[in-house]
Amino acid sequence: MIKDMIDSIEQFAQTQADFPVYDCLGERRTYGQLKRDSDSIAAFIDSLALLAKSPVLVFGAQTYDMLATFVALTKSGHAYIPVDVHSAPERILAIIEIAKPSLIIAIEEFPLTIEGISLVSLSEIESAKLAEMPYERTHSVKGDDNYYIIFTSGTTGQPKGVQISHDNLLSFTNWMIEDAAFDVPKQPQMLAQPPYSFDLSVMYWAPTLALGGTLFALPKELVADFKQLFTTIAQLPVGIWTSTPSFADMAMLSDDFCQAKMPALTHFYFDGEELTVSTARKLFERFPSAKIINAYGPTEATVALSAIEITREMVDNYTRLPIGYPKPDSPTYIIDEDGKELSSGEQGEIIVTGPAVSKGYLNNPEKTAEAFFTFKGQPAYHTGDIGSLTEDNILLYGGRLDFQIKYAGYRIELEDVSQQLNQSPMVASAVAVPRYNKEHKVQNLLAYIVVKDGVKERFDRELELTKAIKASVKDHMMSYMMPSKFLYRDSLPLTPNGKIDIKTLINEVNNR
């Protein structure tokens, strides 16, 4: 069991100083280097005499210097706020306004001029590393101190800073490295794809650093070139793949993404969005011997609260795959609209309790009070997700409360419509979105469709293709759920975190 994240890293700096902690296309950094560099950066940060425990914004991409800076800030007693280099300036400004960081560390060139907050550049970080300053840890992040603060998008467009403490992080990390579903090996070789500003990244760096493994990162200029990206990934000796299912779907566009070309890849960890039956089935075809682990959880409950190994039997028998057994230390309940606990098999809102639940949103007491509460004497969080628990305590997902719509008198779950369309043998990916009238009522349903290779060529007109897709799903899809219009695309937009960008599609059909 891990009791302190930094203690674990320091231990590996002693026992395996020359073992790589970070690898970017063969450019490696070792555990010994990480200790020396983070010590020097921590000493430099202390010299700035920042307000104790004040948060620090760190701007950059998937680089070693980001990782070293995070470790240094933890040593010096400051929570870090990771902000990705691709973030819009308006979002960065909103985060700064809410978080009021005592310092900005710009590992990449910072796009804004901010009055009243000191900015440290990469050259200053490099100079600090060259100084090789020794460091004695006397005030590092501990217990309920914030370890990191990740900003989510927020339904109103105003970002919310989720505060994750050291104790929260330990609850997640110890579960992940000890749980049989994940089956994390010693010295794991992990693909580091999701950006640090997305809490799915914690699923790769926390167990890797806790078990003395290696993070395989990709340069930011490669991420935009999908063909080159997946050609490169196929050449990496990664054993564990952590991403959203959408990113894996993109990877499967490359013929090289298969067990024959990537024999070292034995584990897939998915979180961040729903893993569909079709994606899991395709993965089993590409990687017959691999383990596929489906995890679920909101950022507010520290990355994930449940996980389960997906089997071929599940793929054959479930319409929507189960999302796991809840963590032993995080009792998970299903409640109705009145907050009453529901029995096994009954569908309601998923709430999570226990030591992984965040203390709330940074400097946002109103939103904190809406989402966080106490249930059965434990800190609890309203996930806003619909679900149920089986008698065997397996969590089943039913969609988002805020993606439910009322149409033609029926209450419809948009994700359910998408799932049904994805069952078509002609469909590679599908998303259902509502079109609203002037009274803000749903006028009709539309579907964005990416068809499988070779499908379009079989039809002279899109109308014929649409009829064929509808016919292929009509036996298991209620007629009132069927979208009235199908829009065909070569690909669907993704958020910077690798999820299908449903909000952008909704705005597109409603001309927002």
Swiss-Prot record:
Residues that hold D-alanine according to the record: D199, V303, K499
Keyword rRNA processing: no
Residues that bind ATP: T152, S153, N294, A295, Y296, G297, P298, T299, D385, Y397, G398, G399, R400, K499
Recorded metabolic or biological pathway in which this protein acts: Cell wall biogenesis; lipoteichoic acid biosynthesis
E.C. designation(s): 6.2.1.54
GO cellular component assignments: cytoplasm
GO terms (BP aspect): lipoteichoic acid biosynthetic process
Keywords: ATP-binding, Cytoplasm, Ligase, Nucleotide-binding
Enzyme class, UniProt record, top EC level: ligase
Predominant place of localization: cytoplasm
Cell location: Cytoplasm
Pfam families hit by this protein: AMP-binding, AMP-binding_C
InterPro entries for the chain: AA_adenyl_dom, AMP-bd_C, AMP-bd_C_sf, AMP-binding_CS, AMP-dep_synth/lig_dom, ANL_N_sf, DltA, DltA-like
Catalytic activity: holo-[D-alanyl-carrier protein] + D-alanine + ATP = D-alanyl-[D-alanyl-carrier protein] + AMP + diphosphate
Gene Ontology molecular function: any one: ATP binding
Alphabetized Gene3D superfamilies for the sequence: 3.30.300.30, N-terminal domain of ligase-like (3.40.50.12780)
Nucleotide-binding in keyword set: yes
Function description: Catalyzes the first step in the D-alanylation of lipoteichoic acid (LTA), the activation of D-alanine and its transfer onto the D-alanyl carrier protein (Dcp) DltC. In an ATP-dependent two-step reaction, forms a high energy D-alanyl-AMP intermediate, followed by transfer of the D-alanyl residue as a thiol ester to the phosphopantheinyl prosthetic group of the Dcp. D-alanylation of LTA plays an important role in modulating the properties of the cell wall in Gram-positive bacteria, influencing the net charge of the cell wall.
Family: Belongs to the ATP-dependent AMP-binding enzyme family. DltA subfamily.
Protein name: D-alanine--D-alanyl carrier protein ligase
Organism: Streptococcus pyogenes serotype M6 (strain ATCC BAA-946 / MGAS10394)
Gene of this entry: dltA
